Structures are given as C-alpha cells and as structure tokens.
Amino acid sequence: MATGGYRTSSGLGGSTTDFLEEWKAKREKMRAKQNPPGPAPPGGGSSDAAGKPPAGALGTPAAAAANELNNNLPGGAPAAPAVPGPGGVNCAVGSAMLTRAAPGPRRSEDEPPAASASAAPPPQRDEEEPDGVPEKGKSSGPSARKGKGQIEKRKLREKRRSTGVVNIPAAECLDEYEDDEAGQKERKREDAITQQNTIQNEAVNLLDPGSSYLLQEPPRTVSGRYKSTTSVSEEDVSSRYSRTDRSGFPRYNRDANVSGTLVSSSTLEKKIEDLEKEVVRERQENLRLVRLMQDKEEMIGKLKEEIDLLNRDLDDIEDENEQLKQENKTLLKVVGQLTR
C-alpha cells in the first residue's frame, strides 16, 4: 500500500490518514479518467494535489472526508462528529469505518461542497460514489442493465442458430417432448388408418364379381384342398396386424380384423380362380387332342376302305390276267395249227 505523505505520531492515526489519502488518490484518478483534465490550480503543484494533500492542509481534507462519510451513512445511524484537527480525525474515521459496512443510497442533493480550495471537486461530483460502494453494487447501474440486455440478446441469437449447443430451460424441453410425443401418436394413428384404407381398397379391387361363371367346386372340397394356404395366409395376416393390435388402437381392431379376413378371402379366391383357369385350359387341350384323335381315326378308316377297294381291284385284275393267258395259249395253238 502506497502511503506517502504526512504520518501522525500514533499508529492508528497514521493508518487512517494513509487510508484517506489512498482513497482520495483513487477517487481523483477515477475522475481524471472520466473527465478531461482542467487548468491547473494557481499557486500549487498539480501532481501533489492529485496524488496527496500537503501536510499543512491535513485537517481540512480529513474534515471533508468525515462530512462525506456522514452523508453516506443511513438515516437511522448517528453522524460522526466534526473533526477540528488531526487528533480528532482518528475518532471520526473510526466511527465512520464501523458504520460503513451498510451504506445507504447516496443522493446528489445531500452532498455538501468540499472545504478546501486546493482539492475542489469537479461539477460531476454528485453523480459519483465512493470507491468501496460501487464495488458492492456494481450490477445495479445502467451499464449492468445494458450488459444483461446484451447477454439476453446473445442467448436469443443462440436459440436462433441451427448449430451449436444451446441451453434450453427444462420446462420448454418437457413441453417440446410432450408435443413431439403427441405428434408421433397422431402420425401413427393416421398411418394405421391410411394402411387399413389402402388394404380395404386393394381387397375390393381384387374381388372380381364376373368370375362366377367359371367352374366351381363344392365348398367342402375347396376348403379341404386349400386348408394349408388359408392357415398360412391367416398367420401372415395376424403377424402383419399384430403391431396395430399392440399399439393400443381398440377403435380400429374391428376394421383390422375385417380387412384381414378380406385379404385372406381375396387371396383364396385369386388362387381358386387361377386353378380353375388352369383346369379349363387342360380341358380345352384334352378336347383338342380328342378331336385330333378322331380325325386320325377317320383317316385310318378311309385308308382301310381304300385298301379294301384296291385289293378287290387286284383280284379282278389277276382274274383278267389268267383269262388273257388262257386266251393267248389258245391263240398260239390256233396259229400253230394254221401254219402247219
């Protein structure tokens, strides 16, 4: 601690004087920073007046400090007595130091002017406070409010950013989480409804009312033949719609069951139609083959008849040949007899 200057003979008086001088030096430095330096006072060194008072004028700044400390006291606290000289400075400052822990709000109109001419305060003295008081209440001024507003703006700007980690309050997080859950439930319900509607539409489209003219077998044989396919399709349908049943939509369970039965019946009817079409094709093929067989048999019969006709002709020709041979023999005999 830079004490510099006049020291009293007693240790307590010296410490209080050093404290006052240091406090006044700090105050003057703060004023010099805030206000431009004015013209130097006549008849004295400006550096000594700014840093510490002269030894002869010790009583006057001490009295001014005591008055200023009395003005800083709250309304119910007793004021420090006036200080006539250096001897009384210790008592006044000691009582002021005891009551300085809880200073009240300082008003500009209650502050008296300074007593000494060498340490005359600038015109903005009523707007300033001692060094110890603003350190405690630093966050209650306009600059603090401005800083708080900037911090709030910065927080709002961080909320608007798309990247980075932003500290969101817990209440907002819970509300957003509940909103997300409600939205997901609504989306699940809508998806289930749309899926059921599409399945019903597909089942209606698959049902062909004009397929009744096809050859139909009795229901017992159909059920017995396609029992395995019905069980497999029912298992597929139950596994497909088990999620819908487990998801907690009892309103749509009936629709899901109806759609499942429609899907199973549609698949069965489609398989039956395919099989009936195959049977019709096979029967048509059989008819074609039978017709071919009949045609071939007819051709074979015709050929047999022709063969019989040819055999008869051959017999007739052989008979004629025998007759011609006999006639030739007779002619040869006649010619031989004539030539003799």
From Swiss-Prot:
Positions of region (Selective for apoptosis induction in cancer cells (SAC)): 145-203
Cleavable signal peptide: none
Region (Leucine-zipper): 300-340
Keywords of the record: Apoptosis, Coiled coil, Cytoplasm, Nucleus, Phosphoprotein, Transcription, Transcription regulation
Phosphoserine: residues bearing it: S108, S231
Biased composition (Low complexity): 47-82
Chain spans, region Disordered: 1-253
Domain notes: The leucine-zipper domain is not essential for apoptosis, but is required for sensitization of cells to exogenous apoptotic insults and for interaction with its partners. The SAC domain is a death-inducing domain selective for apoptosis induction in cancer cells. This domain is essential for nuclear entry, Fas activation, inhibition of NF-kappa-B activity and induction of apoptosis in cancer cells.
Species assigned in the record: Homo sapiens (Human)
Substitution effect: L69I: Only slighlty increased interaction with SPSB2. Only slightly increased interaction with SPSB4. Increased interaction with SPSB1, SPSB2 and SPSB4
Residue stretches in coiled coil: 186-206
Stated name of the protein: PRKC apoptosis WT1 regulator protein
GO cellular component terms, semicolon-separated: actin cytoskeleton; actin filament; chromatin; cytoplasm; cytosol; intracellular membrane-bounded organelle; nucleus; plasma membrane
Span(s) of short sequence motif Nuclear localization signal: 145-161
Origin organism lineage: Eukaryota, Metazoa, Chordata, Craniata, Vertebrata
Tissue: Widely expressed. Expression is elevated in various neurodegenerative diseases such as amyotrophic lateral sclerosis, Alzheimer, Parkinson and Huntington diseases and stroke. Down-regulated in several cancers.
Presence of the UniProt keyword Transcription regulation in the record: yes
